[in-house]
Design a protein with these regions (language model features):
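Hydrophobic alpha-helical transmembrane segments
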Residues: 1-175
Length: 178
């Protein structure tokens, strides 16, 4: 457990300093691809009925949670057998990838800076990078509201909940949450 606690602290500090570099492979992308691939296959196997979709959804959930938790657990076990220091390094990187402190701050500050400069087009573009809605007609109040809502939601999804899961069960439970 002490290795997971050290990895938790190192991963958190890495996230504060580095954030999510563009182009760096992110495990959540792989989890999303796994979901898409499994969903396609399960739709072919299970009937298109409420019961079939419920069964397919349950199986999908089970497989994704199992692999998202099991792969990190297995990888950390292998690393620990080689060297506890290797495990610390790998789990630190895993913890770093689960968190979104710096990236959330950086992206939301782009909205703030654009609003402060009075550039509505840049403000709309900046907020469009963090929300899932059409921003082309938003005024400054609506842009501010959209940014605040997104920051509040993503603080829960990308910072608070992952920190809780990482603190309880290390990177494997953090990936289980994701």
């Amino acid at each position: 457990m002490k290795w997971s606690l050290m990895a938790f602290i190192i991963g958190f500090l890495m996230d504060l300093l580095i954030g999510d570099p563009h182009g760096f492979p992110h495990p959540v992308v792989f989890i999303g691809r796994e979901i898409t691939w499994l969903e396609r296959g399960l739709r072919r196997i299970f009937p298109k009925s409420p019961g079939g979709e419920k069964a397919a959804g349950g199986l999908l959930w089970l497989v994704v949670v199992f692999t998202s938790t099991g792969i990190p657990l297995l990888l950390l076990g292998i690393c620990h057998r080689i060297s506890p220091w290797l495990r610390l390094a790998v789990e630190s990187v895993m913890c770093w990838q689960i968190l979104a402190v710096k990236s959330l701050r950086d992206e939301s500050m782009k909205v703030y800076d654009a609003l402060e400069s009075g550039d509505m087009e840049q403000s709309r573009h900046a907020v469009s990078q963090i929300v899932g809605r059409d921003t082309s007609t938003l005024d400054d109040a609506a842009i501010t509201r959209a940014a605040v809502e997104t920051v509040a939601e993503n603080t829960s999804d990308g910072i608070v909940a992952p920190l809780l899961y990482l603190a309880i069960g290390g990177a494997p439970l953090g990936f289980c949450y994701k």
